[in-house]
UniProtKB/Swiss-Prot annotation:
<keyword id="KW-0479">Metal-binding</keyword>
<keyword id="KW-0067">ATP-binding</keyword>
<comment type="subunit">
    <text>Homohexamer. Interacts with PilC.</text>
</comment>
<feature type="binding site">
    <location>
        <position position="819"/>
    </location>
    <ligand>
        <name>Zn(2+)</name>
    </ligand>
</feature>
<dbReference type="GO" id="GO:0005737">
    <property type="term" value="C:cytoplasm"/>
</dbReference>
<keyword id="KW-0547">Nucleotide-binding</keyword>
<dbReference type="GO" id="GO:0005524">
    <property type="term" value="F:ATP binding"/>
</dbReference>
<dbReference type="GO" id="GO:0016887">
    <property type="term" value="F:ATP hydrolysis activity"/>
</dbReference>
<dbReference type="Pfam" id="PF05157">
    <property type="entry name" value="MshEN"/>
</dbReference>
<dbReference type="InterPro" id="IPR037257">
    <property type="entry name" value="T2SS_E_N_sf"/>
</dbReference>
<dbReference type="InterPro" id="IPR001482">
    <property type="entry name" value="T2SS/T4SS_dom"/>
</dbReference>
<comment type="similarity">
    <text>Belongs to the GSP E family.</text>
</comment>
<feature type="binding site">
    <location>
        <begin position="651"/>
        <end position="656"/>
    </location>
    <ligand>
        <name>ATP</name>
    </ligand>
</feature>
<comment type="function">
    <text>ATPase component of the type IV pilus (T4P) that plays a role in surface and host cell adhesion, colonization, biofilm maturation, virulence, and twitching, a form of surface-associated motility facilitated by cycles of extension, adhesion, and retraction of T4P fibers. Acts as a molecular motor to provide the energy that is required for biogenesis of the pilus and the extrusion of substrates generated in the cytoplasm. PilB ATPase activity is also essential for T4P extension while antagonist PilT ATPase activity is required for T4P retraction.</text>
</comment>
<dbReference type="InterPro" id="IPR007831">
    <property type="entry name" value="T2SS_GspE_N"/>
</dbReference>
<keyword id="KW-0963">Cytoplasm</keyword>
<feature type="binding site">
    <location>
        <position position="781"/>
    </location>
    <ligand>
        <name>Zn(2+)</name>
    </ligand>
</feature>
Length: 889
């Protein structure tokens, strides 16, 4: 059975989001792929679902990888020699152009989304690879022609393109729209790059309208200057499925003299569209942007269900038309965007920005909002439930019936991302991300009938992450004790065991299991630690490490090897630390892991960090600020320039706060640059750069480069040295907003730390707008908390008396299954916000100490970390003991 590559998965998702494939079409293609193998693109073409050109266009639009007409490119021998013939055949890659000065080679890939092939070509050539895509026929022709040593028969070159381009060029010459010199120059470039002639000429200044007028004349079509006044006839639009209209760039707009009038955006698809219509047609040509506006008017909704039924032959176009006419008379469902704004879950400008992205790139509004980090998944689920009239379920608050999962098979739940929640009389409540998935509901009903169960299926909405965790918790559980027994048993069977060979299978099971459990328990890190006689595994949950499992010492090498292989690390190197990163996908779990290994006296230790996604980054309103502090915080981050510092130790939530700020202020009209080590959260719309010391890219060097990139906002992952501190301050003084993190114990110490790094006090006073120091304290578990009396010793150490907290209600968690017996579940931030005003500026210039600056700030209303922590303990959020443990006065 063939397995999908990462590139195939990316392609499938892009085609689905663009509306070029329905869910069922993709499912059928995946089933065929499992049978016949090859690439997903080849399967789609063979099944007639998409043309090769349309797939290429989608890859270019979505991933920025252009198409090269490889059969028309003359490849210099020294360029061809960069990749041996067998490797070119194996990797399905042919180098065709070389920029020696820049150290860049252009390579045509048959599977351009296969990152492993690209990386191998870079390793083999020692050059930076600029990827292009090519068609299968062009690749096979070029491979046989340029690598005769392979002994492949040379097929005929793909026909038609060269002749057409030549005619197009002559036509443009006749019209006087280009010069002979410009045409010859473009043809020379075409020979080098294999790009389309028209595209080259437009890049060189030919107006797009002139190109399309020439194409219309060449193909005998009427050119439409605008589609603004055209109102498509719905009955004409029904002649083409929405997916076909998008696939071929064709919109039927009406009827005249017994002919269907069709507007094209690509004249090459005229014959294919005529064949689909199977009736007389009159074709027009419009510019792509004008055509897209017309397409949106003709096909305002995807009508997925209707298209699936028509494609399956279960519904005629006439019946679909009749149903759509009836649908028009029904009350209009309120758009999701309106609901999100009305519920206060999203800002109007964020919804509008997402709608614009949706129009440009396809996909659903809700997915666009979540992927950009503008909307929390929980908020989306609540809005979808409101829009569709279904209940919203939070499994943490409303746990499932343990017997309900027995009603449905595991593979069905995983395939559709659904979960049987509970029985209510004769109704099965089914958790779904999208209750509109008719195919999922049909298959669930069928599965119930096969078991002789006649339950009504009642959809309810939950987040995808919540459903994933339920599936893993109820269907995917494996006992670690059994895996540990397997390690011990195998070790006992051999007098001289070879850990890697002996325990590889059990090690793989163990690593998968521990990642699964860490994911389900919201752990931030997994620690695999060798000790003298065994191996300890711990999970960091809510900031504290908890023992999780113990393995025999002989299991260490096997487990570490599995971790290294996952991250692409060198399994033979055991003397030096190594770092890596991997996207881990197993079952319903999809999580990014940052891996680190370190030699110790008892063997190698490994740490795996589970990275959050952009959609997990909270809004600034959810960062836990006390009311008065929040207003001052919003005012500071709204300033157009200056430097704002966020301080605290590792694990204090600085990154989350930083990106939450960027999420609010990095609007589309601003150029935002970040330099990080490493990049942990990939945020759409932000230019993110990763430190690379081996290549000489440091924080300071990146900052210098940023200043030449016309930035509005700069984020520095960490100010570590004097040079970085000085350049960051200089950037703030020259009209940029700089957000940076620093390691200090409190807010005032950040000022003296900059001074110690060599930044002049008068520059600090002029550039600094504020400092936020923060810590994370554990929250009292809501499921087992009880009211308690304060401990006298704790009060004494906090400098409080019982009279000072009289009337306050303090809580403590007693320990339960939900919190793992700790009494705490989740974490909450405490803050110390120092806002720089004139008095503090004068104190900085005068060289006042951190203690003196802190006292000035407190007189002006600043709450210290301990004071903010006490406020939140008295609110019942955390405990006095936790505040005492996390703060110093």
């Amino acid at each position: 059975m063939s397995v999908l590559t990462i590139g195939d998965k990316r392609l499938g998702a892009a085609l689905l989001d663009a509306g070029l494939l329905t869910d069922e079409e993709l499912q059928r293609a995946l089933e065929r792929h499992r049978e016949v193998g090859g690439s997903l693109a080849e399967v789609l073409v063979d099944m007639g679902l998409l043309s090769e050109r349309r797939i290429a266009q989608t890859i270019e639009d979505r991933f920025g990888i252009p198409l090269v007409e490889l059969h028309r490119v003359e490849i210099p021998p020294k360029v061809k020699a960069l990749l041996p013939a067998e490797k070119a055949k194996e990797l399905k890659a042919i180098p065709f152009a070389l920029d020696e000065e820049a150290g860049v080679v252009r390579v045509a890939f048959l599977n351009p989304l296969d990152t492993l092939s690209l990386e191998e070509v870079e390793d083999l050539t020692g050059l930076v690879v600029e990827p292009y895509q090519t068609t299968k026929s062009a690749f096979l022709y070029a491979l046989a022609k340029h690598y005769p040593e392979l002994g492949l028969p040379v097929p005929p070159p793909p026909s038609g393109e060269g002749q057409k381009d030549l005619k197009l060029g002559e036509l443009l010459l006749q019209k006087g729209w280009i010069s002979r010199e410009a045409l010859e120059e473009a043809l020379v470039e075409q020979e080098k790059t294999g790009d389309l002639l028209g595209r080259i000429l437009v890049r060189k200044g030919l107006p797009e309208e002139a190109l399309y007028r020439a194409l219309a004349e060449q193909k005998g079509l009427e050119f439409l200057e605008s589609t603004e006044g055209i109102v498509p006839d719905p009955s004409a639009a029904l002649l083409l499925l929405r997916s076909d209209a998008l696939r071929y760039g064709a919109v039927p707009i009406g009827f005249q003299n017994g002919e269907v009038e069709v507007v094209l955006s690509d004249p090459r698809h005229k014959e294919a569209v005529a064949q689909l219509l199977n009736r007389p047609a009159r074709f027009y040509l419009a510019l792509p942007q004008a055509w897209e506006e017309l397409f949106r008017r003709a096909y305002p909704q995807k009508n997925r269900l209707g298209e699936v039924l028509v494609q399956e032959g279960k519904l005629s176009r006439e019946a679909l038309k009749e149903a759509l006419e009836v649908q028009k008379g029904l009350p209009r469902a309120k758009p999701l965007g309106e609901i999100l704004v009305e519920l206060g879950l999203a800002r109007p400008e964020d919804v509008e920005e997402a709608l614009q992205k949706q129009r440009r790139g396809g996909g659903r509004l809700e997915d666009t909002l979540v992927q950009s980090g503008k909307l929390r998944p929980e908020a989306l689920a609540q809005a979808v439930a409101t829009q569709l009239g279904y209940p919203y379920v939070d499994p943490e608050e409303d746990p499932p019936d343990p017997g309900a999962p027995l009603l449905l098979p595991e593979d069905l739940c995983r395939r559709y991302g659904v979960f049987p929640h509970r029985l209510e009389g004769n109704r099965l409540v089914l958790l779904m991300k999208d209750p509109r998935n008719i195919l999922a509901l049909d298959d669930v009903r069928l599965a119930l009938k096969r078991k002789g169960l006649n339950y009504e299926v009642a959809p309810a909405v939950a987040t995808e992450a919540a459903i994933t965790k339920l599936i893993e918790r109820f269907y995917g559980k494996a006992e670690l004790s059994e895996i540990a027994k397997e390690f011990a048993k195998k070790q006992a069977e051999e007098e001289v065991p070879s850990p890697l060979e002996l325990d590889e299978s059990a090690a793989q099971k163990f690593v998968k299991q521990v990642i699964r459990e860490a994911f389900l328990q919201d752990a931030s890190d997994i620690h695999i630690e060798p000790r003298q006689n065994d191996v300890q595994v711990r999970l960091r949950i809510d900031g504290a490490l908890r023992p999780y499992s113990t393995l025999p010492k002989g299991a260490l090498n096997a487990v570490i090897s599995v971790v290294k292989i996952m991250g692409g690390l060198n399994i033979a190197e055991k003397r030096l630390p190594q770092d890596g990163r991997v996207r881990y996908r197993e079952g319903a779990i999809d999580v990014d892991l940052r891996l680190s290994t370190l030699p110790t006296v008892y063997g190698e230790k490994a740490v795996m960090r589970l990275l959050k996604k952009a959609s997990d980054i909270p809004e600034i309103e959810d960062l836990g600020f006390a009311p008065g502090v929040f207003e001052r915080f919003k005012e500071v981050i709204s300033k157009p320039y200056g430097i704002f510092l966020i301080t605290g130790p590792t694990g204090s939530g600085k990154s989350f706060t930083t990106f939450s700020i960027l999420k609010r202020i990095a609007t589309p009209d601003k150029n935002t640059q970040t330099i990080e080590d490493p990049v942990e959260y990939e945020i759409p719309g932000i230019n993110q750069t990763q430190v690379n010391p081996q290549a000489g890219l440091t924080f300071a060097r990146a900052l210098r480069a940023f200043l030449r990139q016309d930035p509005d906002i700069i984020m520095v992952g960490e100010i570590r040295d004097s040079e970085t501190a000085k350049i960051a301050t200089e950037a703030a003084l020259t009209g940029h907003l700089v957000i940076a993190t620093l390691h200090t114990n409190d807010a005032a110490q950040a000022i003296t730390r900059l001074d110690e790094m060599g930044v002049e006090p008068f520059n600090i006073s002029a550039a600094l707008i504020g400092v936020l120091s923060q810590r994370l304290v554990r929250r009292v578990c809501e499921h087992c908390k009880v009211e308690v009396k304060p401990d006298p010793e704790t009060l004494r150490r906090l400098g409080l008396s019982e009279a000072e907290i009289q009337g306050a209600r303090l809580y403590k968690g007693m320990g339960c299954e939900r919190c793992g017996g700790t009494g705490y579940k989740g974490r909450y931030a405490i803050h110390e916000l120092l806002v720089v005003d004139d008095e503090i500026r004068h104190a900085i210039v005068a060289g006042k100490s951190a203690t003196e600056i802190k006292e000035i700030a407190r007189r002006k209303g600043m709450k210290t970390l301990r004071e903010d922590g006490l406020y939140k303990a008295l609110q019942g959020i955390t405990t006095l003991e936790e505040v005492l443990a996390r703060t110093i006065e």
